[in-house]
Amino acid sequence: MAKPVRAIVGLGNPGPDYAQTRHNAGALWLEHLARKKGQFLRPDKKLHGDYCKISIAGEDIHLLFPSTFMNRSGQSVLSLSQFYKIELENILVAHDELDIDAGTLRLKFGGGHGGHNGLRDIIRCFGGNKDFPRMRLGIGHPGDKSKVTSHVLGRISKEDMDKLESAFYQLDTHLEAIISGQWDTAMNRLHSFRA
């Protein structure tokens, strides 16, 4: 059951070598949100990440990009949860998703990590709690399991970046519904969207 969102975490790896990779799709959406609101993510040592606060539908929403590497994202999310007293169920985690086409969007509440190391570490740091919302940003599958690592760590092609950016603008349209926890309409629209 979706709850109101009080924070959005965009997963990715830090540094310029990873900035435009498929694995950083969540971080790219977070940067898009901050820019749209005239804000910038700034380093915050206590949160082990880059942080800013924006307003959506009159609500303060915390944005966090963990500056730990992907497989240590949980430490940063736990720091955010503890410092701002936000339950995990109110933190939307945006991440790249291999199993859906580039530019495709899926909202999901709860479930396993599906092999995603960022999700795996968040679940671990919260004592096995899997009950949190996810924004799954499609990056497509390379078609061969042996190519997955090079695919997710590879730079996003111009065509796929255009698809992701179209998806980000589609998300903008439904962000208030997502933030308020009213996912039914947002899911119907987002899940039928194709960039």
UniProtKB/Swiss-Prot annotation:
Role this protein plays: Hydrolyzes ribosome-free peptidyl-tRNAs (with 1 or more amino acids incorporated), which drop off the ribosome during protein synthesis, or as a result of ribosome stalling.
Protein name listed in UniProt: Peptidyl-tRNA hydrolase
Q: Which terms does the record give in the GO molecular function aspect?
A: peptidyl-tRNA hydrolase activity; tRNA binding
- Where are the residues marked Discriminates between blocked and unblocked aminoacyl-tRNA as a site? N13
Its annotated compartments are:
Cytoplasm
Report the active site residues.
H23 (proton acceptor)
State the reactions this protein catalyses: an N-acyl-L-alpha-aminoacyl-tRNA + H2O = an N-acyl-L-amino acid + a tRNA + H(+)
- The residues forming the signal peptide are none
The cross-references to NCBIfam families, in alphabetical order and at most eight, read:
pth (TIGR00447)
What cellular component terms from Gene Ontology apply here?
A: cytoplasm
Q: Which PROSITE patterns match?
A: PEPT_TRNA_HYDROL_2 (PS01196)
Q: Which residues make up the annotated site Stabilizes the basic form of H active site to accept a proton?
A: D96
Query: Pfam families, from UniProt?
Result: Pept_tRNA_hydro
Protein encoded by which gene = pth
User: The organism's lineage?
Assistant: Bacteria, Pseudomonadati, Pseudomonadota, Gammaproteobacteria, Oceanospirillales
